[in-house]
Design a protein with these regions (language model features):
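Register position in tetratricopeptide repeats
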Residues: 113-116, 150-151, 196, 230-232, ...
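Catalytic nucleophile loop of clan PA
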Residues: 2-19
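C-terminal cap/linker of serine protease catalytic domains
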Residues: 19-88
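Canonical tetratricopeptide repeat
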Residues: 106, 143, 189, 223, ...
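Structural marker of alpha-solenoid helical repeat scaffolds
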Residues: 96, 133, 179-180, 212-213, ...
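Helix-start (N-cap) detector for alpha-helical repeat units in TPR-like alpha-solenoids
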Residues: 101-102, 137-142, 182-185, 216-219, ...
Length: 406
């Protein structure tokens, strides 16, 4: 009956065999017991945070039995617990594993994530503690350097850093890690810190070392390409070759995560005068993001298409840009210039007039409108527009005045 539910069943020696359970059927007269061994077999694992039954009972969970499992449990919990519960869990972890540098790094990151400058002293204290207790100093130096670097890149422009936290401090720590074990992941962070400092030549050297290891990936070649591009006196072909290497590392079919690589290479190819190849990369980018692009994308692709005389595609793209951003006068003027280029003078004139109605200080619009009118032998209107362009500071219009208005 009801009164016996959860009562123990024992054998003749007084050993508990199981606990009586309620029958799922109200009518049944049979009872069942859950074996005592079941309770003994219950344990908390790294994935217990996702266990629906354990979450329902609302009782605080113990940490898993090993430090590695407990660290995974901490990681899983960081996504699911509220801030206060997570703090209690980290402190429980440190009570159980007081010599775990990862625990102190977690606590430091917790205080940093609060965004409350008054908590930064606690973050600093925990980073120092991590370095103190670590037996693998290289890993601790890497973790603390990474934490300081992440903090530094999150600062707003002009915002002052906390006490001695700086890129220099992060660099000093990561170089200690690199000195004792030059792991690619350490050298990668060294490159990231140098890049953030604007030391692009040394950042490139670091990324280049990583790219000669099995750790090389699309991301590391991308970083090397950017660092090379920003290094003074760099060769554009070398920059492009590195971006090619990044793209070779991507797996097909290309999805969203591949998109930035193709966008970047499209821009590099356009800068190098390889416009047809640039258009191909813009097209791959477009497919990778399933056509979810901005007006600026259509404008940029149109620029490359114009350079390789793909006029119909260019016209389609600039029309799309204008449709998506009708308030952007630059796009409108570009649309007018495409019409002009393919000798659609009436469409060009209407477009430039619309641009001027939106911004009557746009010198280039007056110049190009005047040029269309000159081509239609309407020199009086043309010269009036050239004069307006000159008045507004246009520097190219003098040649047109010389040709049509003398």
């Amino acid at each position: 009956g009801e009164k016996t539910i959860s009562c123990p069943i024992m054998n003749a020696n007084g050993e508990v065999l199981g606990l009586i359970q309620k029958n799922a059927s109200e009518e049944s007269t049979e009872s069942y017991a859950i074996g005592a061994g079941y309770g003994a077999s219950l344990s908390i694992s790294a994935l217990s945070m996702n266990d629906g039954s354990l979450n329902k009972i609302g009782i605080k969970k113990a940490l898993p039995d090993t430090e590695d499992q407990a660290l995974v449990f901490l990681y899983m919990s960081s996504e699911q617990l509220d801030k206060d519960s997570y703090l209690i869990l980290i402190n429980d972890f440190l009570a159980q594993y007081p010599n775990s540098p990862e625990g102190y790094i977690r606590l430091a990151n917790y205080y940093l994530a609060s965004g409350d400058a008054s908590q930064y002293a606690l973050a600093d204290e925990n980073m120092k503690k991590a370095l103190d207790v670590a037996t693998q100093k290289d890993e601790a130096h890497y973790q603390v350097a990474k934490t300081i670097y992440s903090y530094m890149i999150s600062l707003e422009e002009g915002q002052e850093a906390y006490k001695e936290w700086s890129y220099e401090k992060a660099l000093e720590l990561i170089r200690k890690a690199v000195q004792s074990s030059a792991q690619p992941i350490h050298i990668q962070l060294e490159g990231d810190i140098l890049f953030a400092q604007g030391n692009y030549a040394d950042a490139f050297e670091a990324y280049n070392k990583v790219n000669q290891t099995s750790f090389a990936s699309a991301a590391t070649f991308y970083s090397a390409s950017k660092a090379k591009q920003l290094t003074e006196g760099s060769n554009m072909n070398e920059v492009l070759a590195l971006m090619d290497s990044a793209i070779v590392k991507l797996s097909k079919p290309y999805f969203g995560e591949a998109a930035p690589y193709f966008y970047e290479r499209a821009e590099l190819r356009a800068q190098a005068g390889k416009f047809r190849e640039a258009v191909m990369d813009y097209n791959t980018f477009f497919e990778a993001v399933s056509g979810d692009v901005t007006a600026l994308f259509y404008f940029q692709r149109e620029q490359a298409e114009m350079q390789c005389r793909m006029y119909q595609q260019a016209l389609n793209d600039i029309n799309k840009a204008v449709e998506m951003a009708p308030e952007d006068v630059d796009f409108l003027v570009e649309k007018g210039s495409v019409h002009l280029r393919v000798n659609q003078l009436d469409e060009a004139i209407a477009t430039f007039q619309k641009a001027i109605s939106m911004n009557d200080q746009y010198a280039a619009a007056y110049r190009m409108l005047g040029y269309c009118q000159a081509l239609q032998n309407k020199n009086k209107e043309a010269c009036a527009n050239f004069a307006k362009a000159k008045e507004l500071g246009d520097t190219v219009v003098d040649q047109l005045i010389e040709k049509y208005c003398k």
